[in-house]
Amino acid sequence: MAAARKTNTRKRRVKKNIESGIAHIRSTFNNTIVTITDVHGNALSWSSAGALGFKGSKKSTPFAAQMAAETAAKGSIEHGLKTLEVTVKGPGSGREAAIRALQAAGLEVTAIRDVTPVPHNGCRPPKRRRV
């Protein structure tokens, strides 16, 4: 009794024609994640330092953030994207490098917005590092 083999059928990405979108840059102390969406929030492309093969402390470098932004930008340009609003979240070192990489990839940045969450005296923060 042989089980029927399932062929490897993968859904092809549909090319959308979207002029403007939003780049969400999440820059933490450990990694940088860049997601490019349309104005409604539907993801067009994404990339991160970890997904590109950077490991450990190399993920948190500005160079890794730059490479992640370039990869995400190339994927969104395939969908016809030309202009971007940028939202930056987090305290990481890859914030500025990612924005510069998006501009260098040929996308026009119309606005940069910092949406880092700031507590109004909420949860107690973690203890200070002693190095």
Curated annotation (Swiss-Prot):
Keywords: Ribonucleoprotein, Ribosomal protein, RNA-binding, rRNA-binding. GO terms for molecular function: rRNA binding; structural constituent of ribosome. It comes from the Bacteria. One of its GO terms (cellular component) is ribosome. Located on the platform of the 30S subunit, it bridges several disparate RNA helices of the 16S rRNA. Forms part of the Shine-Dalgarno cleft in the 70S ribosome. Belongs to the universal ribosomal protein uS11 family. This is Small ribosomal subunit protein uS11. It comes from Bacillus licheniformis (strain ATCC 14580 / DSM 13 / JCM 2505 / CCUG 7422 / NBRC 12200 / NCIMB 9375 / NCTC 10341 / NRRL NRS-1264 / Gibson 46). The gene is rpsK.
